[in-house]
């Protein structure tokens, strides 16, 4: 299944379907060979599978693609004492998903002023699937919100299945809360729910610094998004 899926989502046009079917037939022939004692069939499939693994390993994530505007820039965070400087912070004004004003900003936040952290769950496919955002609150400024996104290229559609097969890079978005929550509640008409965490200010600061470290790591070295293992929930859990 993995090999057929990889071929289907990584090859263009009708070639993708034909290659996936061909791989499935080869796998079936290999199983028949194991059952019948015909060694050439499973050996042939093993060679095919190893070749496919070699092709898989040749795919590398990149920051250098023609990204959609809202994911065109990755944030970076510099720390000097208790002050965090967040560059490439998104503060768009959304009227619809296609009609918006672009604003990228640099903002500074005082770690000593962190008061807590909130979670937003934005449900976009009934109750089954939600996108997670983490928002940090401060006593002297507006919240700072982070989201982990599929970094799509212009003209590229999102597919949960394609996300298993090195089809998308991962992106962090650092944003004004009105931008990133408003995009989902107003422009996309999603059902967003706010959960206030019981974390202490110190715990919230520690989580914020963990975000800062991983954001800078991603800016230095791109990663693949994976629907199961590297998504908006699992990455936050590992932080």
PLM-predicted stretches and their roles:
Residues 1-33:
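Membrane-embedded alpha-helical segments of integral membrane proteins
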Residues 28-63:
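Transmembrane alpha-helices and immediately adjacent membrane-cytoplasm interface residues
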Residues 49, 58, 77-80, 84:
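Extended acidic/polar, glycine-enriched regions
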Residues 61-80:
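Alpha-helical transmembrane signal-anchor/signal-peptide segments
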Residues 79, 83-91, 228-239:
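Hydrophobic/aromatic-rich, well-ordered segments within soluble, folded domains that form packed cores
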Residues 79-83, 137-141, 199-204:
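A short, structured loop/turn motif at beta-sheet edges
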Residues 84, 89, 95-192:
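Glycine-rich catalytic cores of cysteine/serine-nucleophile enzymes that process amide/ester linkages
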Residues 175-238:
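Active-site nucleophile-His-acid catalytic modules used for acyl/amide transfer and hydrolysis
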